[in-house]
């Protein structure tokens, strides 16, 4: 018996102890629906991998080092020093890297977070949303003084990127691996370095 996609077929099923017929519906297209869902899932996985590859390439073009991984500790506030009347405080967290399995100390400049309070003594609101277990994507400058870490995970205010001053970012990754917005892209205080 031949079927066509979407065609509903019936099969007689004999019940035990009687000659009653029951009809059971079989949909010829149900197997292909599962295959189509698997194809969509595989395409989504490939797209997220491609997106990460594109993000890594963009980070290299911005003269930065690219890291992704899980937050294992933080965020915590660290006071800074005054620069032209604005406190340059930091937020610190620890990231377990996907690339090499090592823990990195992440030093985040609060002044580049949207809504930064120049007189505040706390983690800025966008960075306060980061929780232990969250996945992050970072582009910045590696350092080894005082331990392994990364900083400059922020905009460089439109200057030409260099290895000393990359045009970096900090993004929270969604469960599907897609990156969110850069949490360190505020240009409000770029005037401090002009």
Regions found by a protein language model. Name each.
Residues 52-194:
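OB-fold and OB-like single-stranded nucleic-acid-recognition modules
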Residues 2, 29-32, 47, 121, ...:
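Intrinsically disordered, low-complexity segments enriched in Ser/Pro/Gly/Ala and basic residues
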Residues 35-43:
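Sec-dependent signal peptide recognition
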Residues 42-51:
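Hydrophobic h-region of N-terminal signal peptides that target proteins for export
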Residues 1-35:
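N-terminal secretory signal peptides that target proteins for export/translocation
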């Amino acid at each position: 018996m031949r079927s066509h996609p979407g065609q509903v077929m019936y099969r007689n099923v004999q019940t035990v102890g009687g000659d009653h017929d029951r009809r059971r519906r079989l949909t010829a297209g149900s197997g292909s629906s599962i295959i189509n869902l698997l194809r969509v899932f595989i395409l989504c996985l490939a797209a997220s991998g491609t997106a990460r590859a594109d993000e890594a390439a963009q980070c290299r073009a911005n003269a930065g080092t690219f890291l992704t991984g899980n937050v294992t500790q933080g965020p915590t506030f660290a006071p800074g020093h005054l620069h032209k009347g604005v406190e340059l405080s930091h937020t610190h967290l620890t990231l377990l890297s996907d690339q090499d399995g090592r823990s990195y100390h992440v030093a985040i400049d609060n002044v580049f977070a949207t809504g930064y309070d120049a007189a505040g003594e706390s983690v800025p609101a966008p960075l306060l949303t980061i929780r232990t277990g969250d996945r992050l994507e970072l582009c910045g400058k590696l350092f080894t003084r005082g331990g392994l870490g990364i900083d400059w995970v922020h905009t460089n205010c439109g200057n030409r990127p260099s290895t000393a001053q990359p045009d970096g970012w900090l993004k929270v990754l969604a469960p599907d691996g897609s990156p969110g917005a850069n949490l360190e892209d505020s240009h409000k205080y770029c005037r401090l370095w002009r």
